[in-house]
């Protein structure tokens, strides 16, 4: 199973990817995480360092790919997760998306692409150019990371459009969205009502999640020394369980930009209406509990 993780830049894709990779490994799966960002820091919390990239290795071999072996580009990370970093060309030169495509070709030539139960692509930012979106050609599922904010949900909508387009010719489905480090989910709820998609999980605004990234450790590694953080790991185990169940997924129908702008901006411009809706929902829940 191949999963592509997208989302707005800085939204927490790498944090979510690393922890979900470990959660999948904890379920007995063999996992490969491929960092598809020129910053090459996707697997930092898995390996504890910035591992050499495909670009670095290729340069050291004078671009003789026949001299590249799996152990030259695949590094063992925490929890038994294997890691690859694609890297990218210098800033302002070349196409990072092209390098990603070449990485997939190289892994296929090394017979490494088909040896895993789960391959997770952690993709750069919210880009929708053909170079990075080409990863959707290889994916069975896409997961979009968001928060309860205006900009992040705009990115979700743009990525949803890319998924719909690729699903025309590939057996690709949107597994769902993941809310990351957000104290509320009311704006997420409003969006998924207008553009139906599953919400796999919403992690709370937990400082320990941010700190784990700074420390270069996953939540699963931190819990070995801070057992009270075990509840954080449950978020990622839940995501992994849903993915491993091979969900039906959806082909999303994105919202036209102007309609989306009105939908999301109205949420901020008319807070009274939103509070009334929330109270109605709470009242309904009270009756349901009774």
Swiss-Prot record:
Q: What class of enzyme is it?
A: oxidoreductase
Fetch the InterPro entries from UniProt. NifH/chlL_CS, NifH/frxC, P-loop_NTPase, Protochlorophyllide_ATP-bd
Please provide, in alphabetical order, the Gene Ontology terms of the cellular component aspect for this entry: chloroplast
Q: Which GO terms describe its biological process?
A: light-independent chlorophyll biosynthetic process; photosynthesis, dark reaction
Please give the cofactor(s) recorded in the UniProt entry for this protein.
[4Fe-4S] cluster
- List of residues binding ATP: 10-15, 39, 180-181
Q: Where does Mg(2+) bind?
A: 14
Reaction(s) the record says it catalyses:
chlorophyllide a + oxidized 2[4Fe-4S]-[ferredoxin] + 2 ADP + 2 phosphate = protochlorophyllide a + reduced 2[4Fe-4S]-[ferredoxin] + 2 ATP + 2 H2O
Which of UniProt's keywords are assigned here? 4Fe-4S, ATP-binding, Chlorophyll biosynthesis, Chloroplast, Iron, Iron-sulfur, Magnesium, Metal-binding, Nucleotide-binding, Oxidoreductase, Photosynthesis, Plastid
Please list which residues make up the signal peptide.
none
Q: Which compartment or compartments is the protein found in?
A: Plastid, Chloroplast
Work out whether the entry's keyword set contains Metal-binding: yes
Look up the record and name the pathway of this protein: Porphyrin-containing compound metabolism; chlorophyll biosynthesis (light-independent)
Family in the record:
Belongs to the NifH/BchL/ChlL family.
Describe the task this protein carries out. Component of the dark-operative protochlorophyllide reductase (DPOR) that uses Mg-ATP and reduced ferredoxin to reduce ring D of protochlorophyllide (Pchlide) to form chlorophyllide a (Chlide). This reaction is light-independent. The L component serves as a unique electron donor to the NB-component of the complex, and binds Mg-ATP.
Quaternary structure per UniProt?
Homodimer. Protochlorophyllide reductase is composed of three subunits; ChlL, ChlN and ChlB.
What's the protein called, per UniProt? Light-independent protochlorophyllide reductase iron-sulfur ATP-binding protein
Species assigned in the record: Anthoceros angustus
Record gene name:
chlL
């Amino acid at each position: 199973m191949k999963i592509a993780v997208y989302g707005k830049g800085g939204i927490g894709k790498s944090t979510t990817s690393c922890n979900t990779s470990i959660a999948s490994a904890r379920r007995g799966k063999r996992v490969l995480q491929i960092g598809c960002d020129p910053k090459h820091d996707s697997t930092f919390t898995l390996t504890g360092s910035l591992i050499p990239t495909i670009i670095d290795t290729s340069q050291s071999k004078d671009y003789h790919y026949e001299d590249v072996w799996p152990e030259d580009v695949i590094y063992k990370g925490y929890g038994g997760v294997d890691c690859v970093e694609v890297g990218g060309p210098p800033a302002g030169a070349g196409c990072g998306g092209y390098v990603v495509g070449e990485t997939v070709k190289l892994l296929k030539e090394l017979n490494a692409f088909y040896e895993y139960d789960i391959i997770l692509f952690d993709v750069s930012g919210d880009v929708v150019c053909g170079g990075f979106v080409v990863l959707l050609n290889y994916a069975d599922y896409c997961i979009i990371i968001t928060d309860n904010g205006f900009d992040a949900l705009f990115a979700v909508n743009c990525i949803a459009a890319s998924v719909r387009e690729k699903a025309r010719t590939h057996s690709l489905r949107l597994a769902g969205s993941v809310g990351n480090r957000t104290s509320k989910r009311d704006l997420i709820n409003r969006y998924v009502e207008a553009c139906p998609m599953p919400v796999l999980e919403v992690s709370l605004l937990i400082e320990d999640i941010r700190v784990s990234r700074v420390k270069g450790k996953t939540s699963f590694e931190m819990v070995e020394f801070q057992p009270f953080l075990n509840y954080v790991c449950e978020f990622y185990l839940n995501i992994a369980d849903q993915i491993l169940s091979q969900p039906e997924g959806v082909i999303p129908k994105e919202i036209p930009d102007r309609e989306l702008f009105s939908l999301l901006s109205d949420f901020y411009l008319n807070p009274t209406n939103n509070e009334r809706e929330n109270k109605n929902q709470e009242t309904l829940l009270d009756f349901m509990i009774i």
